[in-house]
Amino acid sequence: MKNKVVVIVGVPGVGSTTVTNKAIEELKKEGIEYKIVNFGTVMFEIAKEEGLVEHRDQLRKLPPEEQKRIQKLAGKKIAEMAKEFNIVVDTHSTIKTPKGYLPGLPAWVLEELNPDIIVLVEAENDEILMRRLKDETRQRDFESTEDIGEHIFMNRCAAMTYAVLTGATVKIIKNRDFLLDKAVQELIEVLK
């Protein structure tokens, strides 16, 4: 039986990692196992090993050709893992760079991963802004609520494009303030 590959995406600060971790925890209790792989972490490990970055948030500042090369290497590494486990790939649908939006899952990565489902985790623009302002653990560029809305729109466009190329389904889950459990439950149903 083919292992499931589920890609979970969201703009920075939306809480996609939190929703994913809680859903996977609950599924484990039911005997359903997934390995969570953060695409950015795999990219960071490769870039750090090569001496290109010191901290993760520097990745998006690398020249686009470097980012693309590292993406390809990360895609190959994750595809190897998917041969052994059900995989949840925690990543970004698009990455906002100084030169424009970079697809988080370009064709060369999609070919490797061949996802079954793409899940977009979203929230209201102002909720995301407030979460970012409270998070002192990351070095993020400031974005207005309008910028965040544009990024969410670009993520949706990219996710549907990825689906057209792979045949994956696309599910949108809202992670609203004080409704984390609802978002977690929705993701559990998608992953079952």
UniProtKB/Swiss-Prot annotation:
Q: Which family does this protein fall into?
A: Belongs to the archaeal adenylate kinase family.
Cite the HAMAP family for this sequence.
Adenylate_kinase_AdkA
Q: What is the lineage of its organism?
A: Archaea, Methanobacteriati, Methanobacteriota, Methanomada group, Methanococci
Which species expresses this protein natively?
A: Methanocaldococcus jannaschii (strain ATCC 43067 / DSM 2661 / JAL-1 / JCM 10045 / NBRC 100440)
Q: Which reaction does it catalyse?
A: AMP + ATP = 2 ADP
Superkingdom, taxonomy of origin: Archaea
Q: Which gene encodes it?
A: adkA
Q: Which GO terms describe its molecular function?
A: adenylate kinase activity; ATP binding
Q: What is this protein called?
A: Adenylate kinase
State a GO cellular component annotated for this protein. Answer: cytoplasm
- Please indicate if the UniProt record lists Cell membrane as a keyword: no
Its subcellular locations are: Cytoplasm
This enzyme's EC code(s): 2.7.4.3
UniProt keyword terms in alphabetical order? ATP-binding, Cytoplasm, Kinase, Nucleotide-binding, Transferase
Q: How does activity depend on temperature?
A: Active from 70 to 90 degrees Celsius.
Quaternary structure (record): Monomer.
A UniProt-annotated Pfam family = AAA_17
Where on this chain does ATP bind? G10, V11, P12, G13, V14, G15, S16, T17, T18
Record-linked InterPro entries? Adenylate_kinase_AdkA, P-loop_NTPase
Task: Give start-end ranges for the coiled-coil region(s).
Answer: none
